[in-house]
Amino acid sequence: MDNTLTLIKTVYEINQLEEIAAPQIILAGRSNVGKSSLINCLASRKKLAKISSTPGKTRSLNYYEVSPHGYYIVDLPGYGYARCSKTERAKWAKLIDKYLLDNAYVAAAAVLLDSRHNPQQNDLDLISYFKHCNIPIIPIMTKSDKTKQKDRSKVQKKWEDILKVKPICVSSKTGMNRTRLWNLLDVTAIPELAEIEEETE
């Protein structure tokens, strides 16, 4: 049975935050890295997450429920977009900090990395932030259809050297590694699913 995604909640302000007692996987990455496209790819729907030609359009925390497993993918605002004001960026930072504060339900952070570029300081800073919060990292290299295998492998190796884990390469356009990514997200959010898979093999 294929997973389905449903947008359950959108949070713009700190006072809208409330505890959701279910496993959560954060989806984070630079503006224009392809977060909305990846959500739509995972959901097999074109318009679940709005895609904009303007980077940094996601300005809220978006909670997507994953059925049938009952965990959540929480899409964070994109970072690194210069045209957003300092005030707005500070507001997002406070919202994200508050969301993470004492949130025992965060299972991991899926950090999206553009496969066309070498490691960027913005990405390294974000990964350091999550590690400081003791949040495991799932590195995902997006837009893999736009790169040659040889070039992509070089970037992948650089990230593997930094993170000590090999990023998964995906493409929202072609669906590359979609099923593999779903399996990874499932067992990260609910480790018991890995045991069930082993029993059915």
Curated annotation (Swiss-Prot):
GTP binds at residues 29-36, 56-60, 75-78, 142-145, 168-172. Residues 21-191 form the EngB-type G domain. Mg(2+) binds at S36, T58. InterPro entries: G_ENGB_dom (IPR030393), GTP-bd (IPR006073), GTP-bd_ribosome_bio_YsxC (IPR019987), P-loop_NTPase (IPR027417). Gene3D superfamilies: P-loop containing nucleotide triphosphate hydrolases. One of its GO terms (biological process) is division septum assembly. Necessary for normal cell division and for the maintenance of normal septation. This is Probable GTP-binding protein EngB.
